[in-house]
Design a protein with these regions (language model features):
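A conserved beta-strand element that flanks and buttresses the S-adenosyl-L-methionine
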Residues: 105
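A short glycine-rich, Lys/Arg-flanked "PGG" loop and its adjoining helix->strand segment in the class I
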Residues: 120-132
Length: 213
């Protein structure tokens, strides 16, 4: 199941259903400012738009070129194109220089990566691009979500239904909260805080090197 082609197929309809930033992201950014902000797995740019209000320059990275087109259109239509750039790239191999980001948002994307090594490598990449004083927010779907009746992490597919009725399967790794914390602990990130909210695991993180690691 190819992640890029999956989201290229559903990009237009997906974007139509993703208008507003998540409240957890709004809370994370509320009292923070920086020169550069990063949105990993930016989709249609809804969180990049919010980052652009808290950083002088926001960068959105996504594997789907069709979603990047949606994000570019959103930025132009909503007036934040001058302070946002959208780049094609993989969360596990970010096309960005080391130590350049003050703020980062990596939400609703980690759970699409497979296998586990790719998920951890993406966390390492987030650590790599954060500046020494940088801070990020990571989220993933969790077993705490109402739709799941499991306590241990597992792989699954969740169908996306297009307007004509066609279904497109999407890969997910559903994290148990303890497993989410374990993967973060194995990465080059340091966890500042964690919580489970609206069926998602969240972590506020910094780069390990900032703490002498």
């Amino acid at each position: 199941m190819d992640l890029q082609s999956t989201y290229d197929r559903i990009a237009t309809h997906f974007s139509e259903t993703r208008e507003y930033a998540w409240p957890e992201v709004e809370s994370f950014l509320a009292d923070r400012q920086g020169d550069r902000g990063l949105d990993v797995g930016c989709g249609n740019g809804r969180h990049t738009e919010l980052l652009a209000e808290h950083a002088s320059q926001a960068v959105g990275v996504d594997l789907s070129r069709a979603l990047l087109d949606e994000a570019t259109s959103r930025a132009r239509e909503r007036g934040f194109a001058a302070t946002a750039a959208f780049v094609h790239g993989d969360a596990a191999a970010l096309p960005l220089r080391t130590g350049t980001m003050d703020l980062a948002v990596y939400v609703a994307t980690l759970h699409h990566l497979s296998p586990r090594a790719a998920r951890i490598e993406s966390l390492n990449e987030l650590a790599r691009v954060l500046r020494p004083e940088g801070v990020g927010l990571v989220s993933a779907w969790s077993t705490a979500h109402d739709r799941f009746d499991r306590t241990e992490g597992f792989d699954t597919t969740v169908d996306w239904t297009l307007p004509g009725g066609e279904t497109v399967p999407r890969y997910y790794h559903i994290y148990a909260p303890e497993e989410f914390e374990a993967d973060l602990a194995e990465s080059d990130l340091v966890v500042v805080d964690t919580e489970v909210s609206s069926g998602n695991c969240y972590a506020v993180v910094r780069a390990e090197r900032n703490h002498g690691g």
